[in-house]
């Protein structure tokens, strides 16, 4: 008799995705981050659901409702900090996942890659709106500064900002709609994840060598299920350590001050995972130019497949490209550091240099290096 997992209409889909899926035998730990992101999304949706049961999206009570969750709700503090630090783990895994795709040439699967970019934007939007909900000082001023960037759009900018705010400033209407969208978007993300996986399973996974691995495949279960479970344990241990020992390590102390439109914090900055983009935004003196650079810093990923000039897919056997890749990582870390610093000398010039380098590496140096490597190998 045929196994039910191979015949049942629903179980068959799960079986073909998680059990009998043929996977390359050479996948390294860099291929763990997809499943880790799935776990992060699950944790965020669950903790977020329980938090939403106690949260009120009203300017008068939002801050107090978060305090109430931490003080009066059973394990409310745990839910709140798991959700806040879970977002940080989400972005760590997300950036490592994108980095893996860049390094090993996974972007040549264009549909999977483009859905991934959409997912990145959706997760960033969700995180931004979530940061506004506790209604602390940094929530309020972060929302004001970031939404105000849309006013740089010619002709419709000002009207667009007021339309998003639901008034003439960030207020009750803004908080209510941000809560609604923050609740809705993770489910849209979950749906996009399904599409992401659908396109991935059309082509099969890439592998570290970048060479087709059709003759050498192994079943996903038990080999990669056990490998993924080890990844889950490591990530959940790290998340637990962060939540239980230093839950406010990655947060901003200003967010423990209730939102006050009459008092601006000395340094307005987003959460750490947006600092690199924030640094690029601030490095351009022109408002519209800064906004364009901010959007392009992520959207540039969409043209990476077009800029792929190498005859090899992966960077595994391309030492010159590897050097450039790690330089790009260093530039991104520098931008993250600069984003959290005040706008003064020498941080301004460091930020501008790093911003120019970021675009230069991706748009010019990487394609040129790929062409050089082709010539070195007489291709």
Curated annotation (Swiss-Prot):
List, separated by semicolons, the cofactors it needs.
heme b
* Record carries keyword Kinase: no
Pfam families, alphabetically?
Answer: Cytochrom_B_C, Cytochrome_B
Q: Which UniProt keywords apply?
A: Electron transport, Heme, Iron, Membrane, Metal-binding, Mitochondrion, Mitochondrion inner membrane, Respiratory chain, Transmembrane, Transmembrane helix, Transport, Ubiquinone
Name one molecular function that GO assigns to this entry. Answer: metal ion binding
> Which residues hold heme b b562?
83, 182
List the InterPro entries hit by this protein, alphabetically: Cyt_b/b6_C (IPR005798), Cyt_b/b6_C_sf (IPR036150), Cyt_b/b6_N (IPR005797), Cytb/b6-like_sf (IPR027387), Cytochrome_b (IPR030689), Cytochrome_b_C_euk/bac (IPR048260), Cytochrome_b_N_euk/bac (IPR048259), Di-haem_cyt_TM (IPR016174)
Family membership, please give it.
Belongs to the cytochrome b family.
What more is known?
Heme 1 (or BL or b562) is low-potential and absorbs at about 562 nm, and heme 2 (or BH or b566) is high-potential and absorbs at about 566 nm.
Q: How does it assemble?
A: The cytochrome bc1 complex contains 11 subunits: 3 respiratory subunits (MT-CYB, CYC1 and UQCRFS1), 2 core proteins (UQCRC1 and UQCRC2) and 6 low-molecular weight proteins (UQCRH/QCR6, UQCRB/QCR7, UQCRQ/QCR8, UQCR10/QCR9, UQCR11/QCR10 and a cleavage product of UQCRFS1). This cytochrome bc1 complex then forms a dimer.
Q: What exactly does this protein do?
A: Component of the ubiquinol-cytochrome c reductase complex (complex III or cytochrome b-c1 complex) that is part of the mitochondrial respiratory chain. The b-c1 complex mediates electron transfer from ubiquinol to cytochrome c. Contributes to the generation of a proton gradient across the mitochondrial membrane that is then used for ATP synthesis.
Can you name this protein?
Answer: Cytochrome b
């Amino acid at each position: 008799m045929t196994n039910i997992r191979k015949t049942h209409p629903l179980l068959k889909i799960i079986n073909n995705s998680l059990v009998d899926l043929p996977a390359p035998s050479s996948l390294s730990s860099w291929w763990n981050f997809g499943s880790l992101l799935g776990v992060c999304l699950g944790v965020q949706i669950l903790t977020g659901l329980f938090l939403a049961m106690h949260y009120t999206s009203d300017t008068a009570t939002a801050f107090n409702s978060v305090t109430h969750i931490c003080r009066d709700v059973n394990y409310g503090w745990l839910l709140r900090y798991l959700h806040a630090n879970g977002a940080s783990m989400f972005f760590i895994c997300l950036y490592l996942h994108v980095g893996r795709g860049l390094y090993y040439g996974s972007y040549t699967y264009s549909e999977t890659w483009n859905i991934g970019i959409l997912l990145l934007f959706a997760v960033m939007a969700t995180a931004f709106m979530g940061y506004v909900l506790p209604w602390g000082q940094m929530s309020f001023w972060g929302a004001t500064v970031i939404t105000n960037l849309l006013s740089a759009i010619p002709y419709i900018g000002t009207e667009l900002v007021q339309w998003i705010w639901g008034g003439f400033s960030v207020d009750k209407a803004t908080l209510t709609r941000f809560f609604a969208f923050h609740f809705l978007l993770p489910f849209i993300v979950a749906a996009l994840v399904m599409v992401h996986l659908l396109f991935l399973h059309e082509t099969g996974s890439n592998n570290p060598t970048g060479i087709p691995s059709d003759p050498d495949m192994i079943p996903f279960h038990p080999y990669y299920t056990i490998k993924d479970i080890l990844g889950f344990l490591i990530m959940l241990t790290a998340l637990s350590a962060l939540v239980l020992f230093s839950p406010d390590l990655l947060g901003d102390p200003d967010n423990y001050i209730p939102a006050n439109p009459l008092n601006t914090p000395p340094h307005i900055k987003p959460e750490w995972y947006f600092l690199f983009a924030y640094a690029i935004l601030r490095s351009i003196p022109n408002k519209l130019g800064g906004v364009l650079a901010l959007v392009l810093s992520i959207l540039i990923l969409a043209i990476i497949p077009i800029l792929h000039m190498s005859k090899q897919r992966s960077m595994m056997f391309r030492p010159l490209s590897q050097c450039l890749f790690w330089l790009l990582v260093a530039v991104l870390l520098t931008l993250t550091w600069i984003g959290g610093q005040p706008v003064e000398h020498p941080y301004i010039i460091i930020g501008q240099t790093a911003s120019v380098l970021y675009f230069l590496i991706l748009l010019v140096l990487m394609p040129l290096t790929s062409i050089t490597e082709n010539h070195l190998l007489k291709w």
